[in-house]
Amino acid sequence: MRAIRALVDAYTTDRRLLSKATVTLYEAVQEFWVAVDEQDGTVAGCGALHVMWEDLAEIRTVAVDPSRRGQKIGHRIVSVLLDQARELGVRRVFCLTFETRFFGSFGFTEIDGAPVPHSVYEQLLRSYDEGVAEFLDLERVKPNTLGNTRMLLHL
């Protein structure tokens, strides 16, 4: 977990990733996929897939060791997460990002609002997960998400 924490922190100072409490990372540790350097055993990158509803998931907290950028680690992480989504039967994957070209290379497109029926929206309002609140674009989290782009991929 310390390695994931360090990767996240490397991108939150310039607000390229939303800051997360360490307890939140621990609560979601089973959602993470971690890329490990085979030579030295260090964590090179991470990313998580959070299922929100029967047909909807979010890719979140994708981070690569800054010294290893450009090595396609992020691409491999997102590819694995999309494969996991397919295996789970998820048909749509959401992300909230500044990296629109990166996610666009996978087929993500920009969206407005929360692409769920009102009945699902009402159920999602009951979630305590901050990422779900960000997906719903709730007023209380808007200061955290300023400048981010909402994107969706249909699998």
Language model features by range: what are they?
Residues 15-38, 44-64:
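A conserved beta-strand-loop-helix scaffold within acyl/acetyltransferase catalytic domains
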Residues 64, 70-85, 94-95:
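Conserved acetyl-CoA-binding loop-helix of GNAT-fold acetyltransferases
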Residues 6, 83, 101:
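Surface-exposed charge patches
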Residues 18-21, 78-81, 137-138:
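A generic local structural motif
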Residues 86-88, 92-155:
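Terminal substrate-recognition subdomain of acyl/acetyltransferases
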